[in-house]
Regions:
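Acidic/His-rich structured neighborhood in mature extracellular/periplasmic domains
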Residues: 116-258, 264
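Flexible, glycine-rich surface segments
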Residues: 212, 216-324
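Bacterial N-terminal signal peptides that target proteins for export
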Residues: 17-37
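Extreme N-terminal basic, low-complexity initiation segments
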Residues: 2-13
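Solvent-exposed loop/turn segments at secondary-structure junctions
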Residues: 97-98, 164-168, 222, 269, ...
């Protein structure tokens, strides 16, 4: 652990102050420290991100946001705690429109959680792998620079962007101000969270000097190619090309640097594995599987797993001593028989779950990263 701590300190010393969190980041609500991306809010990434503008249907009659006492109180609170004027906040929120389809999307139940063999195939398609290779080829210098600075492999950054938005194809078409206002003021179940994100969004627009009425994003207010929520944008997004602004929609440098910074800031361990196939002794299988809860176990030292008849193939000699978990992935049935694969989940797997807490998401990022790297390595020089 001392080695990893020293490694992190050296890397932090390398990061220039120009990509530190913005002034006021310490005031960000605690929810901003979670995996605040669109796919962190839903199990299935991009389930509704491409809903078109103007598709909201007929909304019930309701007072415009500018006329509502709760909205005026929110504007006053923003003005009292930031350097944004109350009239500016009220003017911006006067331009926000309630979107009933957003509320419907948030309330849509996931009747049966998907299994690995149902969840992963669309996200591991040949089209997505090819798009990832092309993105890597185009941005090879930036990805190499980010890997050198943050210690995050290029294929992992590329895979996350592929899962989230297919490299910017599906960044969402709702106005962000509409999405966040709808969920902040007309979705009581998550109102505190989304009021915090609306606050972060207005601060972000103020700091970046763009109108909050223009950007579009997901139905949950996630932004750009990496689908950062506003709080994560303010805390983790970086101006990786040094042009004085951060653009997560169109600037590949900022996108790549921001994703790598996010993972590094959540304790990515350079050179360490994500997943390795697990081997479970026949006499230990029942006891090992009883440790699983929702397809993943608690974390224990690798030596403790080994003592219980569970080990991993090809463990690097310099593997970190951090605790690891046992992961189950449901494979497609054969002849009516359920099948599963088992994996040892190393600390970097859990770092990916800080981007999205789903074990299926993190496993898909790993699988897509492996597929993209293999395809990239197979290209002629």
């Amino acid at each position: 652990m001392e080695r990893e701590g020293a490694q992190r300190k050296r890397r932090e010393a390398m990061i220039p102050s120009s990509i530190s969190p913005p002034l006021g980041a310490n005031r960000i609500a605690s929810v901003s420290h979670r995996a605040l991306t669109l796919s962190a809010l839903l199990l299935l990434p991009q389930a509704f991100a491409a809903e078109p503008l103007g598709s909201a249907g007929t909304a019930p009659a309701r007072a415009p946001y500018a006329q509502r006492a709760d909205v005026r109180a929110f504007a006053a609170e923003i003005a009292a705690s930031t350097d944004i004027g109350q009239r500016d906040v009220e003017r911006w929120l006067a331009g926000a429109k309630y979107q009933p389809r957003i509320v419907a999307a948030m309330d849509r139940p996931l009747l049966v959680p998907p299994k690995w063999f149902e969840y992963s195939p669309p996200l591991l398609s040949s089209d997505r792998v090819s798009a990832g290779v092309a993105f890597w080829r185009t941005n090879a210098y930036l990805l190499a620079r980010a890997e050198a600075l943050y210690g995050v492999p290029a294929e992992v950054v590329v895979a996350i962007l592929g899962v989230e938005t297919i490299y910017g194809r599906n960044t969402g078409r709702y106005r962000v101000i509409d999405a966040l206002a709808t969920l902040a003021f007309d979705y009581p179940r998550r109102a505190p969270f989304f009021r915090g994100e609306l606050r972060e969004y207005l601060l972000l627009a103020h700091e970046q000097r763009w109108s909050p009425l223009v950007p579009t994003g997901s139905f949950a207010g996630a932004l750009g190619m990496p689908q950062f929520m506003p709080g994560s944008h303010r805390q983790y997004a970086v101006d990786f090309d040094g042009d004085g602004r951060i653009d997560l929609w169109h600037d590949s440098a900022d996108v790549i640097g921001s994703v790598a910074n996010y993972l590094a800031r959540h304790d990515w361990l350079e050179g360490q594995p994500i997943l390795l196939p697990a081997r479970i002794a026949a006499e230990s299988q029942d006891a090992a599987l009883r440790r699983l809860d929702g397809g993943i176990s608690e974390r224990r030292p690798l030596a403790a797993w080994n003592a219980d008849g569970v080990d991993a193939a090809d463990v690097p000699a310099d593997v970190a001593a951090d605790p690891v978990g046992l992961l189950l992935l449901e494979e497609a049935p054969e002849n009516g028989e359920a099948r599963a694969s088992y994996w040892i989940a190393f600390p970097n797997f859990y770092v990916i779950t800080r981007y999205n807490k789903s074990r299926l998401y993190a496993a898909t990022v790993f699988a897509l990263a492996q597929a993209i790297k293999a395809a990239r390595d197979a290209e002629p020089l």
